[in-house]
A protein has these predicted regions:
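Conserved catalytic core of two-metal-ion nucleotidyltransferases
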Residues: 99-142
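Alpha-helical phosphate/pyrophosphate-handling elements in metalloenzyme active cores
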Residues: 46
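Short, surface-exposed, charged loop/turn segments at secondary-structure junctions
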Residues: 159-165
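Conserved small/polar residues in nucleotide/adenosyl-binding loops
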Residues: 169-170
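Short gly/ser-rich loop at a beta-strand->alpha-helix junction or flexible surface loop bordering the NTP-binding
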Residues: 53-61
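Catalytic metal-binding acidic patch
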Residues: 59, 67-88
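A generic, well-ordered mixed alpha/beta core segment in the N-terminal half of proteins
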Residues: 83, 87-99
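N-terminal regions immediately upstream of nucleotidyltransferase
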Residues: 1-36
């Protein structure tokens, strides 16, 4: 599942996870693929220091850090009441570089929040497409949101290893 350039093939890894899961897991392939992308994005954010000003929360946090069985779509964060967008300069390119590094056939588009956006939440929209993907299927899309709200009891928790095969491909 590792390419000649040292990247891993997340689609092959997801297929292996679904196959190992047994009958009835076939419909979950896109969900498992998205969860592997979540791991990759969170790893890149941690390596670049973006978690110093953010608290991971929401459904994906419950699944990846607290063991919830429910799959979730998006990545949600609390940035605090004094959240400053400047602390996240470079987040889009960090995500794009990390996901593009998964192979030559991976195309990543990150839509950044509008600089003049009002409100409490800033949203990045991440679209991932692979060359082998059928044109009639949509890209994997992940929304990353940062809300200007406090996190009342933040805890440092590692992401759980939902798929032991992933341990073979960590850098």
């Amino acid at each position: 599942m590792t390419g000649a350039d040292g990247t891993y093939d997340y689609k092959a890894m997801a297929a292996g996870i679904v196959l190992a899961g047994g009958e009835g897991m076939g419909n979950l392939l896109p969900v498992v693929e998205k969860e592997l992308l979540h791991y990759r994005i969170l790893d890149a954010m941690m390596r670049e220091g973006f978690f110093s000003s953010l608290v991971f929360q929401g459904g994906t946090s419950l699944r990846l850090c607290h063991g919830s069985p429910r799959y979730s779509e998006d990545l949600d964060f609390a940035g605090g009441t004094s959240f400053d967008m400047d602390t996240l300069k470079g987040l889009g390119s960090c995500i794009s570089d990390s996901l593009s590094g998964m192979g030559d056939d991976v195309t990543v588009r990150v839509k950044e929040p509008r600089p003049d956006a009002d409100g409490l939440t800033r949203r990045w929209r991440i679209a991932i497409r692979t060359a082998g993907q059928r044109k009639d299927l949509p890209s994997q899309t992940i929304k990353l949101e940062v809300a200007s709200i406090p996190a009342y009891e933040p805890q440092h928790r590692p992401a759980l290893v939902n798929y032991p095969i992933c341990l073979l491909y960590t850098s």
